[in-house]
Amino acid sequence: MTALAYYQIHLIYTLPILGLLGLLTSPILTKFDIYKISILVFIAFSATTPWDSWIIRNGAWTYPSAESGQGVFGTFLDVPYEEYAFFVIQTVITGLVYVLATRHLLPSLALPKTRSSALSLALKALIPLPIIYLFTAHPSPSPDPLVTDHYFYMRALSLLITPPTMLLAALSGEYAFDWKSGRAKSTIAAIMIPTVYLIWVDYVAVGQDSWSINDEKIVGWRLGGVLPIEEAMFFLLTNLMIVLGLSACDHTQALYLLHGRTIYGNKKMPSSFPLITPPVLSLFFSSRPYSSQPKRDLELAVKLLEEKSRSFFVASAGFPSEVRERLVGLYAFCRVTDDLIDSPEVSSNPHATIDMVSDFLTLLFGPPLHPSQPDKILSSPLLPPSHPSRPTGMYPLPPPPSLSPAELVQFLTERVPVQYHFAFRLLAKLQGLIPRYPLDELLRGYTTDLIFPLSTEAVQARKTPIETTADLLDYGLCVAGSVAELLVYVSWASAPSQVPATIEEREAVLVASREMGTALQLVNIARDIKGDATEGRFYLPLSFFGLRDESKLAIPTDWTEPRPQDFDKLLSLSPSSTLPSSNASESFRFEWKTYSLPLVAYAEDLAKHSYKGIDRLPTEVQAGMRAACASYLLIGREIKVVWKGDVGERRTVAGWRRVRKVLSVVMSGWEGQ
């Protein structure tokens, strides 16, 4: 078998895997990922070059001469050009594996509860110095590279690895190996996967004589009788150092995300590359303890969404960390306010609760704004016209009112149940990043919900707040389109350079997001027709049953004759109905699919219509938006394909199917629905 030259090792073994990892990570790779990997490449290149030059001059390893036909292209400081390429390739491979292994994690959840003192950190970093001394003080009879020194490679390795690794471990080791948040497993995977692969590549290369390790400079233990143990240790320890360096970057980002308001006060926070901001660096190296409350708030939000909004939480892994943590806080606020207003056991006066939330919005954002250019307000052809008081696509947002921590604490203490304080604090962190109007729309949707469950009089009169398709779509705009619009503003805050320049362009993106949010709400309504009816909630338009004239906007259906008897069947499920309950009788035949499928079809039309606008979002959030939409629309597909027998039971999607769908959409882009 012909021996391989060094460059051929790259062509066959390292560059293909690098290309594959680049392909896999390209939809989710962020500027911050590129930034931190680039930092590590620079450090690896700068630190390893003099070290490698030194061990080559001391005869630790050699490469074939040009005359052998396996020679290298050339050298600089005695180091082959191909070796310089290896410095870069290994760091990037490990960095991309780290991105894949940690993308599903929220950086802030791994922050330690307490900070070590500066003296403690310094002592931890100095611990390895005596160990290094023991290795480097080992007697060597001569500096001549031909002289036997079996500990040379191991000593050299300890000199290269130990100081930076111990410093990084002292600063961010506890963060990188946090078991509670799951980061430790991802850290170990990010170290071991590239390590095992590169050890195998080295095994092949040494066996092929692509390069040679001097037997006189190693202890003599070989893996498989071929690869010196020092080579395996090199890959393990350098990958440990790389991953700890990447973890330190994420550590600073976590401090920025959780404690940015403490650092910057009411000033606008920078949106990218938090490592280079002196205030964040000062907090990273500071021995001052920081509040554990922001982390606890985020933990409670994650727990809430894992229990009540699993589809969103799984899909949110497609967003960059900065956007994702803000969206988790925003979505948790929406869930909490829904519970506050909608649950009698939580709030005995839901209208007063709506007033309380509105007052909180005034505290954060000031009074409602009115459109500066009403003629610029756009509407979707598939949705009702936007409310005339809706502001146009404002950017940048006007400065928010000044809000001191004491004012926030006072409001929460006096007016919000203590178990929900976390969600209000998380929304307060978005002050200045999102507008008020979509949240006012959300409250308008809650007001519609308060009409349910229907009174006995309303049941007898066949009267609901959702009379026509336009009413249904307006409700969807309020409770879901508004949240999607807020998502756009959160994404713009993370990438201000990618915000469309004109009002018309911004409005097009916002309208597309409202279409998508409404589409997802229609899927939820289609899924929950029976469950909602048993709670006295009726979101199907009365016009579906021929009980009202349809609006100009009409969801196409398969029937032409009025079907008021079907609405009566639904009413019989309501707790306030005086009609005989027929749910368990032989005569109860409600064709659930007949009414759910038109909603799903219209939702898919809305989603498709929104794709062009959604694709104009900042590049880094597009994968997350696709994932969120696909996760919800999968429920619609479940209704169409899997729902058998018109039983009307609530459909859920298996977790593994949801994850598979999210991954496929993130990697491939929009798919035909």
Curated annotation (Swiss-Prot):
This enzyme's EC code(s): 5.5.1.19, 2.5.1.32
- Please state the pathway this protein functions in, per its UniProt record: Carotenoid biosynthesis; beta-carotene biosynthesis; Carotenoid biosynthesis; phytoene biosynthesis; all-trans-phytoene from geranylgeranyl diphosphate: step 1/1
What induces or represses this gene? Down-regulated in stationary phase.
Q: Name one Pfam family in it.
A: SQS_PSY
Q: Does the keyword 4Fe-4S apply?
A: no
Report keywords, A-Z: Carotenoid biosynthesis, Isomerase, Membrane, Multifunctional enzyme, Transferase, Transmembrane, Transmembrane helix
Bilayer topology reads: Multi-pass membrane protein
Q: What does the entry list under GO cellular component? A: membrane
Ranges where the record places region Disordered: 376-399
Q: Per the record, which residues fall in region Lycopene beta-cyclase?
A: 1-251
**Where are the stretches annotated Phytoene synthase?**
258-673
Q: Where in the cell is it found?
A: Membrane
Q: Which reaction does it catalyse?
A: all-trans-lycopene = gamma-carotene; gamma-carotene = all-trans-beta-carotene; 2 (2E,6E,10E)-geranylgeranyl diphosphate = 15-cis-phytoene + 2 diphosphate
Q: Which GO terms describe its biological process?
A: carotene biosynthetic process; carotenoid biosynthetic process
Provide the transmembrane region boundaries: 9-29, 36-56, 81-101, 117-137, 157-177, 187-207, 226-246
Q: Which GO terms describe its molecular function?
A: 15-cis-phytoene synthase activity; intramolecular lyase activity; lycopene beta cyclase activity; squalene synthase [NAD(P)H] activity
Give the domain of life: Eukaryota
Q: To which protein family does this belong? A: In the N-terminal section; belongs to the lycopene beta-cyclase family.
Return the PANTHER family for the record: BIFUNCTIONAL LYCOPENE CYCLASE/PHYTOENE SYNTHASE
Q: What does this protein do?
A: Bifunctional enzyme that catalyzes the reactions from geranylgeranyl diphosphate to phytoene (phytoene synthase) and lycopene to beta-carotene via the intermediate gamma-carotene (lycopene cyclase). The cyclase preferentially catalyzes the symmetric cyclization of both ends of the substrate to produce dicyclic carotenoids. Beta-carotene is further processed to the acidic carotenoid astaxanthin.
Q: What is this protein called?
A: Bifunctional lycopene cyclase/phytoene synthase
- What species is given as this protein's source? Phaffia rhodozyma
Taxonomic lineage of this organism?
A: Eukaryota, Fungi, Dikarya, Basidiomycota, Agaricomycotina
Record gene name: crtYB
